[in-house]
Amino acid sequence: MVKLAIDMMGGDNAPDIVLEAVQKAVEDFKDLEIILFGDEKKYNLNHERIEFRHCSEKIEMEDEPVRAIKRKKDSSMVKMAEAVKSGEADGCVSAGNTGALMSAGLFIVGRIKGVARPALVVTLPTIDGKGFVFLDVGANADAKPEHLLQYAQLGDIYAQKIRGIDNPKISLLNIGTEPAKGNSLTKKSYELLNHDHSLNFVGNIEAKTLMDGDTDVVVTDGYTGNMVLKNLEGTAKSIGKMLKDTIMSSTKNKLAGAILKKDLAEFAKKMDYSEYGGSVLLGLEGTVVKAHGSSNAKAFYSAIRQAKIAGEQNIVQTMKETVGESNE
């Protein structure tokens, strides 16, 4: 049995989509228990494997992260993180303030001893449909080569345990594929990754080939990773809008769109980030999953499923035994 703590109040569409996703999750997974944290006036679920705990405060999207965690002690996000810290819950999921959730992860859940800097990881789609693990996407703006090596170690475990990939191929995001390409950070990181024989490091990868499906894990610093992530999200939205506008521009195009409707739907599903769940803050003493702030019920459900798999696979313990102990 896996028990998860859920922030009912975080996100643009909370609590409705959270309640819908939780209801579906407990129906689909008979070995899942949920502790919901939020406003009792907005709670309307009744299930033997769902426990509700009232919280008098909520962390808003515009709140300053660290200050909010310290001052709003009875907020749904803080109480959720405390449930993970105490061991009452195996992991947690929130669509709330990203900075506040990372602060709650660091200051409440706690960092694994030996992990220098936790990393935020996300699974992104590829043209072949299998996707790839990408980190860091914003936990740390600055990074040293040693941090990128550790990100690769964390990503390697994540790809194996969560995505079920044996001996995942690991790449370093760079401006060229040659070993000597890049700045001092990427050059030194390349050396460290190449000398870690526990990793299946396959070399550099350029941004233009990220979605080709040639690798399983891509490592970069949080500043670069966040910009790449937002660029991909923005590009996908723009292409979708352009395609829709083109289809609706004439009768001929509308007929073509109708003929291709099924194929376009399959393509959209393949490229839908919500199929992969949320982003995960790796390197903590518990599983912390960040669902997208604008998540619908489907995306939040995927994030719950992701946290459940992490609990089943005992990913935190694996990280303690490998990354943590090797860096003490």
From Swiss-Prot:
A GO-annotated cellular component:
cytoplasm
Name the pathway it acts in: Lipid metabolism; phospholipid metabolism
Q: Report the InterPro entries cross-referenced here.
A: FA_synthesis, Phospholipid_synth_PlsX-like
Subcellular location(s) of the protein: Cytoplasm
| Highest taxon, organism lineage | Bacteria
Family stated for the protein in its record? Belongs to the PlsX family.
Quaternary arrangement and interactors, per the entry?
Homodimer. Probably interacts with PlsY.
Q: What protein does this entry describe?
A: Phosphate acyltransferase
